[in-house]
Amino acid sequence: MSKNLFMDLSSISEKEKGSVEFQIFRLTNRVVKLTYHFKKHGKDYSSQRGLWKILGKRKRLLAYLFKTNFVSYENLIIQLGIRGLKKN
């Protein structure tokens, strides 16, 4: 995989695991893994549907973080190397 986004999960408390930032981090890891999977299995349409659901959930969480804590949103976007939300 091109991006390895791993974190030592034992050092993270249960409260931090429920945070929006951590949820976005976990969803981004799943997106990276599925993207790698699709390079080998391009016609796996059921997994593509799952990927779209994950992307939708991540987008909603990013929108929430954008509204509530913009500084944290910007830091997370840079740290994960993903695009931010579209600006209208």
Curated annotation (Swiss-Prot):
Task: Say which species the protein is native to.
Answer: Marchantia polymorpha
Q: Which SUPFAM superfamilies match?
A: S15/NS1 RNA-binding domain
Q: Which Pfam families does the record cross-reference, listed alphabetically?
A: Ribosomal_S15
Q: Which GO terms describe its biological process?
A: translation
Per the record, GO CC terms?
Answer: chloroplast; ribonucleoprotein complex; ribosome
PROSITE patterns linked: RIBOSOMAL_S15
Q: Which GO terms describe its molecular function?
A: structural constituent of ribosome
Q: Which PANTHER family match?
A: RIBOSOMAL PROTEIN S15, BACTERIAL AND ORGANELLAR (PTHR23321), SMALL RIBOSOMAL SUBUNIT PROTEIN US15M (PTHR23321:SF26)
- Could you tell me what this protein is called? Small ribosomal subunit protein uS15c
By its UniProt entry, which InterPro entries does this protein fall under? Answer: Ribosomal_uS15 (IPR000589), Ribosomal_uS15_bac-type (IPR005290), uS15_NS1_RNA-bd_sf (IPR009068)
Q: Where does the UniProt entry say this protein principally localizes? A: plastid
SMART domains noted in UniProt: Ribosomal_S15
* Keyword line: Chloroplast, Plastid, Ribonucleoprotein, Ribosomal protein
Tell me where it resides.
Answer: Plastid, Chloroplast
State the similarity comment: Belongs to the universal ribosomal protein uS15 family.
Report quaternary structure and partners: Part of the 30S ribosomal subunit.
